[in-house]
Amino acid sequence: MTLKGKKVTVHDMTLRDGMHPKRHLMTLDQMTAIATGLDAAGVPLIEVTHGDGLGGSSVNYGFPAHTDEEYLGAVIPKMKNAKVSALLLPGIGTVDHLKMARDLGVHTIRVATHCTEADVSEQHITMARKLEMDTVGFLMMAHMNSAEGLVKQAKLMESYGANCIYVTDSAGHLLPEGVKERLSAVRAALKPETELGFHGHHNLAMGVANSIAAIEVGANRIDAAAAGLGAGAGNTPMEVLIAVCSLMGIETGVDVAKITDVAEDLVVPMMDFPIRIDRDALTLGYAGVYGSFLLFAKRASAKYGVPARDILVELGRRGMVGGQEDMIEDTAITMARERGLLK
C-alpha cells in the first residue's frame, strides 16, 4: 500500500527514554541543547522527564541530576514550535506531579501502565482531561498481551478520556506482523477521532520496520530518539525513521539533515557507551524483557558474577515487568547461590 501523503506526528524520546542509558544524569545544558536542536529540526513533540516518568527519582529507579521541575522549567521556555510532553506511571507519579507539569507548560501527558493494567490509569487520565491536556494512554510491554486483550485495555483508557492510545513495544520483542496484528485490532476498536501511537525499541533492529508497519495500519503518532538514545539497544533511531519516511512520501515535518546533525553532533558525543545491539540488548528483545532492565542486569552481573544475559533470560522466564527493578538483584543473588558463586 502507498503511504505517500500520510501525515505522522513524530514524538521524541531522547530526553526521557534516553535518560535510562545516561542513568538519569543529563545536565540541564545537555537537555536544553538537544531540545532546541530537535525544535529547530521540526520535531513537534518532545518528552522530558526522569526515564521512569514524573516522580521517578528513587532508590529503585535511580536519582537524576536534576528534578523534573528543573528539567521542564529549563526546556519549555526555549521551545519555539515544539510542544513538550511528560510520562507518568501511576504508582510512581501522582496527580500532584501531573498538576505541576501542567503548571509548567507541559502540553501532553502520557499515562503508562503495563499492558494488562489499564484500570490503574483512570484517576490520572481523568484528571489530565479535566486539565485540558493532550492525554495519551500508554500500554507498555505490548508483546505480553494478545490483540484482543490490548483492545480491551485500550478501550478502558479511551473510556477514561484518553484521546490517543499507544501500543508500546517496551522490550523490542515484536516483529512487524505482531505490530500490525495488535495495532490494526486496536485501531478498529477505537473511536475514529482517537489517535493511535506506536513506541518501538531496536533490540532486534526492528524499530524502523515496526514503526512503518504501525503507520500502515493506522498509527499516526510514532516515537523515536535521536541516535536511538534509549533503553536497551535504544529507541527507533529518529534520523533513520525520518529518512525512510521521506523516501516513502510520509510527511513528518522533520528535516532529514537537521535531525541527523542533532544525532551526530549533540547526542552521540553525550553517550556514556555506544547504543548498539550487544549480546545483552539482543537478549532483551529475544527474551521479551523490559528495556530499562539492561543496566540493572549488567550491574548485578558485575556484583555477583552471573552473566547479564543469563539474568535477563531468567527475568523473561519469570515474566518480570517494568516496576520490578528491585527483583533483578534478588534474581542475580539466587542464581549466584545456585551456581556456587555465593556462600
UniProtKB/Swiss-Prot annotation:
Name of the featured protein: 4-hydroxy-2-oxovalerate aldolase 4
Tell me which domain of life the UniProt entry assigns to the organism this sequence originates from. Answer: Bacteria
Sorted alphabetically, the Gene Ontology BP terms of this entry are:
catabolic process; L-leucine biosynthetic process
Could you say which residues bind substrate here? 16-17, 170, 199, 290
**PANTHER family given in the database record:** 2-ISOPROPYLMALATE SYNTHASE 1, CHLOROPLASTIC-RELATED, HOMOCITRATE SYNTHASE-RELATED
List the catalytic activities from the record. Answer: (S)-4-hydroxy-2-oxopentanoate = acetaldehyde + pyruvate
Pfam families in the cross-refs:
DmpG_comm, HMGL-like
Keywords, sorted A to Z: Aromatic hydrocarbons catabolism, Lyase, Manganese, Metal-binding
- Going by the record, the broad EC class of this enzyme is lyase
Under Enzyme Commission nomenclature, its number is 4.1.3.39
User: What residues does the record give for site: Transition state stabilizer?
Assistant: 16
